[in-house]
Amino acid sequence: MRPERNNISIYNPQWLAGFTSGEGSFGVKVRNPKENSKAFIELIFQINQHVRDKQLIACIAEYLECGNIYKHSLNAVVYRVSKRSDLTERVIPFFIKYPILGIKALDFKDFCSLAELISNKAHYTEEGLDQIIRIKANMNTGRILEG
């Protein structure tokens, strides 16, 4: 079993981008609207880790200056950012400057598209909501790679 580490700091933003490429996720929750009401769309950036790495998760939250840390289970902690202003002013600009690599880069690109659609209030129209749902369906495990 790996021991807990103390005195963890993040000095290299590229390290955080690489760590996120492997351990982070970009997602969206769509809460179905009732008739004649607006859909609720929640964008989420999160990193899950074993509880022994809770100090690392705290350092990531401190480094990005946003988000919350939750105990997910006996053995897991979650760093989550869902506040739109934190996503658009901190998280998205950070990963534009220090790019995500690999397949997760496609999820980040979709995440940015969703943030823009929401910013433009596209989710208040049926067409916009359909577009958001299509993008969501093709993110993460729903992504089909051509090849």
Question: Residues of each region from the PLM?
Answer:
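Sequence-level preference for short, compositionally simple segments enriched
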Residues: M1-G147
